[in-house]
C-alpha cells in the first residue's frame, strides 16, 4: 500500500538521523512513523474528513466517575451538546443519559475503542478510566489492567487517528523521596502505590508518544479534587468530600487521616476549567507535556476549623486508616504550579473559605429538599 510504504520511509529517515549527543533530535510535531499498531489489511472503517476550524468532537472515557459528568457538561456548553460523547462500562443514571450522547466503551477492548473514535469522528479524547489509590491497592491486578493496559489502548488509538489526548495525573505520582513542600513539575517521583506507578507510566508514555509519533498529549497532575455532587471514589483525599456530607447530615465526622496531614486540594470547578484551558492552549505555549496545578493546601484539622465557622456544633474525631495514612504521608504537601501559571495562564478561583461555603451551601440545600420531601 503506497501510504504505508511512504510512512515507513518517513520513519526510516527519522530514526536514521544522527543525535547530537546531549539532546534528542528535533522531531516533527505530528505523525513521525508507522502507527504503534499495524492496521490489518482487511480493516474496513468509514473515514470522514474533519476540518480543524470546526468544533472538536470529544470522547470522555470513564465518564461516570467523579469528574466525567461535570466535564461533559462544561464541554457541551462550550462546543455543543452533540459534540461531546460520555462513555463508561456502567449504566448511566437517567439524568446523565438524557443530558447528551452516552455510549458503552470498554477501554480494554481496543477494537471497540477504535470503532468509536472512527465512527464518531472523534478529535479530542479525555481518558478518565482508572482505579484510584486506595481501591487500586486492594485490587492490584485489576488496577494494572485498567490503568496501564487501558492506557496503552488509548495511546495507540490516539496516535493512529491524530487525536488531541488528555490524561489526568495526580499527586499520587510522587513518593516519599520526592520534595514535598513544594513539589515542582520535574523531580524524583518513585510512588509506592499501583495507582501512582500507573500515572508515572502514563506521563512518560504520553511524552514518548509525543516525541515518537507526534501525539498531541496533554496532562495535568491534579491535587485532591473536592466535588459536591458526586460520591467519593476510593481515593485517599475522599475525607475532604465526605466531611461536608456528614457535617450537614449528622453534625459530626470521623476522619481516616491524622489531623495534621497536609495535602494539596482543588474545588472541582477549578479542576474542570484547568482541564479545558490546557486543552485549548496553543501548542507552542506548552513547554511541558505534564503540568502541576494547584489551588490550596490544608489539613483535616484546618478544614474542620473552617467548617466550625458555619456549623458551631460540628465535631470531628479521628480513626486513622493505616493504608490511606501511609499513602498520604508519601504525597506532596503543596504543589508548585508556577509553570502552568506562566505558560497558559492558569489561575484558581476557590480558596479554602470559598470552598467550604460552596460545599456546605450545596449539601444544606439538598438536605432541606430531602426533609421537605
Curated annotation (Swiss-Prot):
GO terms for biological process: L-threonine catabolic process to glycine; threonine catabolic process. Belongs to the NAD(P)-dependent epimerase/dehydratase family. It is found in: Mitochondrion. Gene3D superfamilies: NAD(P)-binding Rossmann-like Domain. Catalyzes the NAD(+)-dependent oxidation of L-threonine to 2-amino-3-ketobutyrate, mediating L-threonine catabolism. Homodimer. It catalyses: L-threonine + NAD(+) = (2S)-2-amino-3-oxobutanoate + NADH + H(+). Its EC number is 1.1.1.103. InterPro entries: Epimerase_deHydtase, NAD(P)-bd_dom_sf, NAD(P)_epim/dehydratase. Keywords: Mitochondrion, NAD, Oxidoreductase, Transit peptide. The lineage of its organism: Eukaryota, Metazoa, Chordata, Craniata, Vertebrata. This is L-threonine 3-dehydrogenase, mitochondrial. Pathway: Amino-acid degradation; L-threonine degradation via oxydo-reductase pathway; glycine from L-threonine: step 1/2. It holds the Pfam family Epimerase. The active site is at residue 195. NAD(+) binds at residues 62-67, 88-90, 106-107, 195, 199, 225. Disulfide bonds: none annotated. GO terms for cellular component: mitochondrion. The gene is TDH.
